[in-house]
């Protein structure tokens, strides 16, 4: 696999805008599921150990974060699959749990490295936070180990770090704009941003060996 940097911000946004048609329903069912589970776990935590400074509360909060980590990655996986022209059933949300152990190991390693980068000069931490963006998806889609995924993501994104950072800034701006009219714009913006990230991933690493499907339209 030879990562490539052959993509442009305008192109991925345009392609994502086209591909969000027929994708929004599954995306928001998955997103709603994520939100409901988050709320449920938060309520359970509050009713059992609370959210104070106790050791028990800290341990439960860490456990909840680790439980939710694969689920959040599943949301991003929907965008990657859509960008690659593959089926995006709501069940995609649960797929990262089959790789939960390497994902958690990767997350711990990534956190240590990013925090160390921030302690050094801040800028290395920012660089790594962006450069490691694709690591969890390389574990799922390319069956890499934790360290291999981190290094592959870092080396690939380094080729176009500023361009990808620009895409993230644009995504933030679009999110803010979409939030202004009582959040209605996010119905389109969130799926577009998810697919746009998936477009970059797919253009960089290629699609996996799964069967490509014709994109459905509303």
Predicted regions and their residues:
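Juxtamembrane "helix exit" motif at the C-terminal ends of alpha-helical transmembrane segments
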Residues: 38-51, 178-179
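Selective recognition of hydrophobic, aromatic-rich stretches within alpha-helical transmembrane segments
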Residues: 3-4, 53-87, 111-151, 179-211
């Amino acid at each position: 696999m030879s990562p490539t940097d052959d993509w442009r911000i305008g192109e991925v946004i345009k392609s994502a805008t086209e591909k969000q048609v027929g994708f929004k329903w599954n995306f928001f069912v998955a997103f709603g599921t994520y939100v409901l589970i988050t709320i449920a776990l938060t309520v359970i935590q509050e009713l059992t150990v609370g959210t104070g400074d106790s050791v028990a509360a800290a341990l439960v909060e860490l456990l909840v974060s680790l439980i939710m980590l694969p689920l959040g990655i599943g949301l991003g996986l929907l965008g990657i699959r859509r960008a690659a022209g593959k089926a995006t059933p709501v069940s995609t949300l649960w797929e990262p749990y089959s790789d939960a152990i390497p994902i958690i190991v990767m997350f711990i390693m990534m956190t240590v490295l990013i925090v160390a980068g921030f302690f050094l000069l801040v800028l290395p931490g920012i660089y790594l936070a962006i450069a490691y963006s694709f690591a969890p998806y390389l574990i799922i889609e390319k069956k890499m180990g934790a360290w291999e995924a981190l290094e592959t993501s870092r080396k690939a994104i380094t080729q176009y770090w500023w361009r990808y950072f620009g895409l993230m800034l644009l995504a933030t701006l679009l999110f803010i704009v979409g939030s202004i009219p009582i959040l209605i714009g996010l119905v389109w913006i969130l799926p577009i941003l998810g697919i746009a990230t998936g477009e970059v991933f797919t253009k960089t690493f290629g699609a996996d060996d799964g069967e490509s499907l014709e994109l459905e339209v509303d």
